[in-house]
């Protein structure tokens, strides 16, 4: 059985780390963290790695997702941080965008349902990056799928995920933007249904409240969680986090 993952989140907007709340990107402010007095991505990632002993990071390049200039040079700097693994959602729209990231040495490339134009983008990524480096983010708002992909636009999460799995996807992220930054806590019944249905790895982002939440997801055989707000506001105790990450 694969190790349960706890992955810190870095949301980048205007080339600095921001505090994401409810997917309302026009209201995002620079991150204020108890861990580091900076909103500079390399500083924050380095500090988080050192204090949590977690060597993996999830990056959402919101500049790219919002169809602005992607943070290519910043990504290159982040990848020079010693012993760091990067999962990034850079707002992939078309298959041709995948090649822009295939040579970076990423741990995984994330395809968000919110941005991809069609399902063939997923198939192309599986071919280019391989199944172990391809992650599909099931982007939702209050459990309604966010997407422009015609085949799944009016479908529920369970039907959508079934289609995604049939393409050969082995890892998904359940990401409800409404829950982001709110520390709502608990496991939604929908997520438990997804866990029963989907045979691959499931990461969960948005709404993680505390260590107890993390332990619950681990107990229910999810593959990992993405943590942001509860880490940076001090709710998650570092000693307990390090302990659960080791076990």
Regions found by a protein language model. Name each.
Residues 81, 86-108, 190-224:
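Catalytic cores of alpha/beta
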Residues 5-12, 57-59, 86-90, 109-111, ...:
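Hydrophobic faces of well-ordered beta-strands that scaffold small-molecule active sites
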Residues 8, 12-32, 102, 106-180:
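Conserved anion-binding
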Residues 21-63:
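N-terminal beta-alpha supersecondary unit
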Residues 104-121, 176-179, 206-213, 220-240:
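Glycine-rich phosphate-binding active-site loops on the catalytic face of alpha/beta enzymes
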Residues 36-50, 94-99, 152-163, 214:
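Short, acidic/polar
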Residues 69-76, 150-159, 184-192:
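Charged helix-capping and loop-helix junction motifs
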Residues 50-104, 188:
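N-terminal active-site wall of soluble small-molecule enzyme domains
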């Amino acid at each position: 059985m694969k190790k349960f993952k706890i992955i810190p989140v870095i949301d980048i907007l205007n080339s600095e780390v921001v505090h994401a709340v409810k997917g309302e990107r026009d209201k995002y402010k620079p991150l204020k963290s108890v861990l580091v007095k900076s909103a500079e991505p390399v500083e924050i990632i380095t500090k988080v790695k050192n204090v949590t002993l977690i060597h993996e990071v999830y990056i959402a390049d919101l500049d790219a997702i919002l169809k602005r200039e992607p943070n290519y040079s910043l990504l290159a700097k982040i990848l020079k941080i010693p012993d760091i693994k990067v999962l990034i959602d850079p707002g992939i729209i078309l298959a041709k965008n995948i090649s822009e990231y295939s040579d970076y040495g990423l741990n995984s490339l994330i395809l968000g349902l919110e941005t991809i134009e069609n399902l063939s983008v997923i198939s192309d990524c599986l071919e280019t990056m391989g199944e172990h480096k391809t992650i599909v983010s099931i982007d939702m708002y209050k459990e309604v799928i966010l997407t422009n992909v015609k085949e799944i636009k009016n479908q529920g999460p369970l039907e959508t995920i079934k289609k995604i799995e049939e393409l050969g996807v082995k890892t998904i992220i359940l990401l409800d933007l409404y829950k982001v930054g709110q520390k709502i806590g608990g496991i939604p019944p929908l997520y438990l249904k997804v866990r029963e249905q989907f045979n691959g790895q499931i990461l969960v982002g948005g709404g993680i409240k505390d260590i107890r939440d993390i332990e619950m997801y681990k107990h229910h055989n999810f593959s990992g969680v993405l943590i942001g707000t509860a880490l940076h506001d001090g709710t998650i105790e570092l000693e307990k986090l390090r302990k659960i990450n080791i076990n």
